[in-house]
């Protein structure tokens, strides 16, 4: 049996990939990619994640762009507003943002899917490479998939 989604194919013989999809027990490594200022649900998600020490080792938070409403008229402004909101939330729960919160891309990836440089992108790549099949990095992306 195979699973298809937009050209991506996984067969039951792809045990490495399928094993990565299985729920893990214990502490998992994760980063959060979020357009926190866009809507309030991301703020709740960020705080819940930070308070879930017994299950999630949060290794970073990345500000994602947004521009779909009156809060931001372009992706860069949306990302900056989200970055500032992340800092405010962490301050309220007494968590340092140093080497933990990173600014994301200033524009959307778009249909060309070209690489856009940003501190969040570099940090995400670094953290992913630190992982392994036994200890993967989970990327919780609740904003635009641009970082």
Could you tell me what each predicted segment is?
Residues 1-147:
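N-terminal acidic, glycine/proline-rich low-complexity segments
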């Amino acid at each position: 049996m195979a699973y298809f989604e937009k050209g991506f194919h996984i067969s039951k013989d792809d045990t490495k990939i399928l094993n990565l999809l299985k729920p893990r027990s214990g502490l998992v490594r994760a980063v959060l990619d979020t357009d926190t200022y866009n809507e309030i649900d991301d703020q709740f998600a960020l705080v819940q994640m930070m308070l879930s020490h017994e299950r999630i080792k949060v290794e970073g938070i990345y500000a994602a762009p947004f521009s779909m409403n009156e809060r931001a008229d372009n992706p860069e402004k949306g990302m900056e507003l989200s970055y500032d909101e992340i800092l405010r939330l962490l301050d309220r729960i007494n968590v340092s943002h140093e080497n933990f919160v990173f600014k994301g891309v200033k524009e959307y990836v778009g249909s060309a899917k070209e690489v856009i440089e940003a501190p969040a992108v570099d940090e995400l790549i670094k953290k992913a490479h630190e992982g392994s099949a036994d200890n993967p990095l989970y990327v919780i992306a609740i904003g635009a998939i641009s970082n």
